[in-house]
Regions:
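Alpha-helical interface subdomain recognition
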Residues: 1-42, 105, 186-271
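Short, mixed charged/polar active-site loops
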Residues: 89-91, 128-131, 156
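DPxDG-like acidic metal-binding loop motif
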Residues: 104-137
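Flexible, small-/acidic-enriched active-site or ligand-binding loops
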Residues: 139-165, 174
């Protein structure tokens, strides 16, 4: 982070607003896909952002690549876990066939459905659960747009697998999956710090954002939940301090809830 700050980090910042997901994806592919350091990747993504949808997606992509290191880093993926537990859409299950792994069922929340190249899914439950990476163009996968949710610029969708056969080579390791919830928050917080570092008019707030990012980067490989609680307090304070002095951030008042919403769960958990 020190090297990034000492260099002219504003050199590649967008010259104007990026209002469409496809535009931010193209920008991300050009300037960030080759970044191997996932903490810097999330932070830089936040610096390039001008709204919270891009902050979320920047952190989300680093979290996915952290969790599933087998995944390519040069395009977007979506980790689809949610299912219709109370409705009529059956959840995703699998069976083994001579041709490979047969998938049938639905995933009800796919982030960045318009841009993602790969959908990562959990199929089955309990001891039967497996994780697979499926190309968005699979002939037996249907992706349907749904009404946009909590971040208006981010596309969302539903995935329907109907007799979709995938190779066992598409199986992913689940060794880091249990940590995804925590990891996702940390990378999104990093992206938020990047947003504040590049958009705040207050030099003290900017300094704080860089310092907090350093702290967060040290936690992505740590299991110290108390430290996460401490850094969450600092991130929420940063959010309060940054409000009112941000330049060119679309939807700040409405969408800062993205950062606020994680805090209650973090602070209510035991150490």
């Amino acid at each position: 982070f020190e090297e990034l700050r000492n260099n002219d980090f504003q050199e590649n910042l967008p010259l104007g607003p990026i209002g469409r997901e496809s535009e931010f994806y193209a920008f991300w592919c050009k300037y960030l896909s080759g970044e191997k350091n996932l903490t810097l990747k999330a932070f830089k993504g936040g610096m390039f952002s001008d709204r919270f949808a891009w902050v979320f997606l920047s952190g989300y992509q680093s979290a996915i690549q952290h969790t599933f290191s087998e995944m390519s880093s040069d395009h977007w993926a979506s980790f689809a876990v949610s299912e219709d537990r109370r409705g009529t859409l059956p959840g995703l299950d699998w069976s083994k066939t001579e041709k490979g792994i047969l998938l049938n069922g639905y995933k009800t929340w796919v982030a960045a459905v318009d841009q993602m190249n790969t959908i990562i899914v959990k199929a089955g439950r309990g001891d039967r659960a497996v994780y697979l990476a499926v190309d968005r163009d699979h002939s037996n996968l249907t992706l349907t747009r749904k009404e946009q949710g909590f971040l208006p610029e981010m596309s969302e969708g539903v995935a329907h697998f109907q007799d979709a056969v995938v190779s066992e080579k598409d199986l992913l390791s689940d060794k880091n999956v249990k940590q995804f919830g925590k990891i996702e928050i940390l990378y999104i917080y990093l992206a938020f710090c990047g947003l504040v570092a590049s958009k705040s008019k207050d030099t003290t707030v900017v300094d704080n954002s860089w310092a907090i990012a350093e702290e967060i980067s040290a936690l992505v490989h740590s299991e110290d939940f108390f430290a996460l609680k401490e850094v969450d307090v600092k991130v929420q304070q940063l959010r309060d301090e940054a409000g009112g002095n941000m330049l060119g951030v679309s939807g700040w008042d409405a969408d800062q809830k993205l950062i606020a919403m994680y805090s209650k769960g973090i602070q209510s958990r035991g150490d």
